[in-house]
Amino acid sequence: MITEKEYSAKVGLEHRKKYAQFFTPEFISDFMTDWIFHENPTCCKILEPAFGLGVFSRSILKRKSQICITGYDIDDTVLGVAKANFASKSDIISIAKADYLESKWDAKYDGIICNPPYLKYHDYDNGRYISQINSHLGTNLNGFTNIYTLFLLKSIAQLNEGGRLAYIIPSEFLNSDYGIEVKRFLLQSGTLKHIIIVDFTECAFDDALTTACILFCQKDNSEHDIRFSVIKDVSTLSSALTNYVSYEISELDAEIKWRQ
């Protein structure tokens, strides 16, 4: 099993930046995976839209062995390592060399977990992707939209009833102009449950210092408040589940900054 640390030591930073490969620390992967399975006993079909080396699959398999995982990635280098790492699990883990945003929309999943690529609008062919998302979801995303939010919106649309989603992404969309439409969709879909803002100053994402947020969503059509937590020390990440401020959906305005 080649770990993210070993891979990063062998594969140059230029290559990893080209494919926006900033790997999730395992304790964060475990935390996100716990959300996927919490009160979701029938969860058996899971999607990893940005598979990488499979840190989420490792966390998943620690919790449930009878599972079906579908993964996507476009980088031959990381795919070769990932497929070797999970060669003995090929019956339950399917990893495709394909662009998730080009995959079929009608596939549905009980759990979706992801650390998507972080690419600015000028670093990828955003026009085609944005048109597809707008067409499928009825959104009005603009040309400055970061690719990680496209992953997020498509994934929400692919949840089964009762399905759960955990994403870790930059928090910039909470305050940016392009994020207004993203937040509007999150509110209108009724799936957003919890936003955990985490200061990663002391826990770099593999050479990428960032303030990120973890999003928990569920498709359950229930009336609920939306929780917000801010974590300054990643060692206290689990405290976000009990230490939060909650708002009714009607109290949140997509056009207002959500992070102070």
List the predicted regions and their residue ranges.
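N-terminal, positively charged/glycine-rich alpha-helical extensions of SAM-dependent methyltransferases
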Residues: M1-E14
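Glycine-rich helix-loop-beta junction characteristic of Rossmann-like nucleotide cofactor-binding loops
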Residues: W35-P41
